[in-house]
Design a protein with these regions (language model features):
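Heptad-repeat amphipathic alpha-helical coiled-coil interaction surface used
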Residues: 113, 120, 124-127, 134, ...
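Basic helix-turn-helix/winged-helix DNA-binding cores
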Residues: 1-90
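Inter-helical turn/loop segments and adjacent helix faces that build the functional surface
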Residues: 165
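Alpha-helical scaffold segments that form or flank carboxylate-/histidine-based iron centers
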Residues: 39, 67, 139-148
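Amphipathic alpha-helical dimerization/coiled-coil segments
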Residues: 80-125
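A surface-exposed regulatory interaction patch that couples sensing to output
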Residues: 98, 130-136
Length: 165
């Protein structure tokens, strides 16, 4: 779902070519937010079929045609709904969470707080589960300690974000 959110978010700032959408996302968020052609173009076609975006074909002499995509009012509504929707299943996914944080400017205070609270609850559950594990070897203990540390660090970050929203 994060690919759809990023794609529509990119179009909220104006019409763009597919390649431009891909490059802008990677330039802003880095390579951790994978968006390859096999993800981008099927999503663009699906959104076009839904009426969420429009496509204008720009003919080029001696070159392949280029498609310019723009978001519609329906697309804006779909984008807002997708961004706000953050069920527990999605909240366990790091990228889904980080994409929503990156787009916090598009959410109001209550929506931001809800995203952070849902993720915080998930992390507390994960921490409880990890703490109950039986570490029967040195390396398992290392993995458990690393996982606890990562979760605790993210919980501190969420606490910090709560003060900034």
């Amino acid at each position: 779902m994060y690919v759809d959110i990023l794609l529509l978010a990119e179009l909220t700032s104006g019409p763009k070519y597919g390649y431009e959408i891909k490059k802008n996302i990677q330039n802003r968020l880095g390579e951790n937010f994978e968006l390859n052609h096999n993800m981008l173009y099927p999503s663009l076609r699906r959104f076009e079929n839904m009426g969420a975006i429009t496509k204008k074909v720009h003919t080029q002499v001696g070159k392949p045609n280029r498609n310019m995509y723009d978001i519609t009012e329906t697309g804006e509504e779909i984008f807002s709904e997708m961004l706000r929707e953050f069920p527990e299943k999605l909240a366990t996914n790091n990228i889904e969470f980080l994409v929503r944080i990156a787009l916090f400017e598009k959410l109001d205070y209550e929506e931001r707080k809800e995203v952070l609270t849902i993720r915080q609850d998930i992390l507390h559950k994960q921490l409880t589960a990890i703490q109950s594990l039986d570490a029967n070897s040195f390396f398992i203990t290392e993995v458990i300690d690393f996982s606890k540390s990562r979760i605790e660090h993210e919980l501190l970050w969420i606490t910090s974000l709560m003060k900034k929203i």
